[in-house]
Amino acid sequence: MNTNTVLVFKTSVTHPQQVRQLRPLLDALVDRRGQWNFDLEDCDNILRVETQRLPAMAIVSALQVRGFACEEL
């Protein structure tokens, strides 16, 4: 039985428009059984990713390449 892992990141994503821009990227990175969401009301603009196989560094790199700060907590 595979279980999902929850990854938590501090990001510089601050606006819903930025989340919409990142949606295709995050949907492609996270497998079908996973999910992701931003908490833009949190002071650290938290990104939570629930996935079975995706390494945290893949998320960090993908956001950084697009100009956003991202670090795993």
Feature-to-residue mapping (PLM):
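A short linear hydrophobic-aromatic micro-motif
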Residues: 32-38, 71
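Short Gly/Ser/Thr- and Asp/Glu-enriched loop/turn motifs at secondary-structure junctions
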Residues: 40-44
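Alpha-helical structural elements
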Residues: 4, 31-33, 63
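Short amphipathic alpha-helix segments
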Residues: 12-31
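A generic structural motif
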Residues: 45-49
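C-terminal structural segments of small proteins and small subunits
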Residues: 6-10, 23-24, 50-73
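Short glycine-/aliphatic-rich beta-strand segments at the starts of folded cytosolic domains
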Residues: 1-15
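Poly-acidic low-complexity segments
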Residues: 38-39, 55
